[in-house]
Amino acid sequence: MTEWYKKGDLDFSKIHTVNLDEYKGIDAENKQSYHYFMNQHLFSRVNIELQNTFVPDGMNENQDEECQRYEKLIAGLGGVDLQLLGLGHNGHIGFNEPAEVFVKQTHCVSLSEKTIQANQRFFE
């Protein structure tokens, strides 16, 4: 996307981003946080207004409060029109492991052992 932006094929000036996930207990300035990753690899390289970029607050000790805040934020933006995401090694989305029932609202999950092992390389 940054290459498209550099070529003038993509404009970020009027969009809002709502990140899918963040690690709990890691602040936005930590190099392992998704917030930091997005700043380094996208937000700082395109013409997006930083006040239009949203990532869950991994440092909010009250996870229920943070989930409610994020749901209100999404609703206030009119919902999510397009979601760009990756799939985990076992098909998980946003650390939600494959299951028969999928929780739609913002929530916190515990990582499976396989997911922890797969992501361990980012914390070495």
Which residues does each PLM region occupy?
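Glycine-rich N-terminal segment of FAD-binding domains in flavoprotein oxidoreductases
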Residues: 1-7
